[in-house]
């Protein structure tokens, strides 16, 4: 296997050639204790570019086939993913959004300028009713991100009442006037977003005091139990987490964390589709870097909360590349290659390992923005490689995490990051069925993987593989099926040992039978 990087055993940075090592592993099928919360497969929809308008929503009068204004093709694709939770309306947009502008007759709703994302004029035709009805159609939990940056305590408190009160209250009456008699069930409430940045440029001490105040007035109505989420840190800001844990403590049910696989926040972030192997391996290292970040935030939380009553939610994550040439600046429209699929699989593998504290993750974003599941253009829709990873991995939702030991080659890439050539995760569902997902990160070489299955009684395994001719391959409107799962048969089980021949740059999910 040829690498232009030093392995972890060597300090030199010259090119050299080595042979791919055999990969060995053991699944501890009887040691699973933690559930992989299905909310780790959460999604995120912001009023940004064409995520909402043209992506999820076209309006009931559109010629694009729709149900009550929601695109039929996108709806069905998302139902097939079993989306567990959807975060809305932002993102940075959330702290400029005033919910009362998005209720009542659509033709009477006031317009606003979306200052964070390209200055687009927002007509508010997609508001509270449209979002919560969408969640009902998808069968997912809504996650409301409240406006703390430019809003008021009263505004957010009234929004909670509007959505969740079934009583004879002013906001419940207003909701009924707008066509919804029965209150919705809204579990997740984010008290602000990125309050250290676009959500108000606050200090953690100041935000902590605001959270305490807001949380008092965001009440539980008629059996609805709010799960209140504090606006947490950006990647390496461990002090933010420490201050919040010290000052808020278990007044919050959870603290958020944002981590993007991005080269930096100034200058070019790199092309989504034009990159070399060195760029690819660096991206894998940056994606895997989220594990160290989670560990360090967890360690801070463990000191203040050893019983793990406060959860950690990675409610924004994914790749962030330069916008596609010819698209509107500030709309964050990017293509999605096999490289992005690996960022998804490696990240989900990490999330599974920390389910004792990590209870939700929301990839950014669901349609047409950043590392999206789906791209749309007028009447057309295309599913991305990332979509297929989420579809292949959905078998892990709410299953029991099974520890898996794996020994494989590792390489060092720039910025002192280390990348194992194989990543793996395993789970057992409520029926006792074991699923294993394997990612061969190696761009050039197949991997021969031998896994000890322990006491499992499996006789065979069936599964799917996601790969492509090139790492830069992607699905376009002209060629929508370049990167798509196919049946996988290169696996054999004999006397408790599974042997898998995993092609280069491939992702596989197996079911043991």
Language-model features and meaning:
Residues 4, 19-254, 287-323, 327-513:
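Non-catalytic accessory regions flanking glycosidase/transglycosidase catalytic cores in CAZymes
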Residues 284:
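Gly/Pro-rich active-site loop or hairpin
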Residues 250-252, 256-266:
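Anion-binding catalytic surfaces of enzymes that hydrolyze or transfer phosphate/sulfate esters
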Residues 261-281, 327:
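Active-site His/acidic residue clusters
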Residues 7-15:
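Bacterial N-terminal signal peptides
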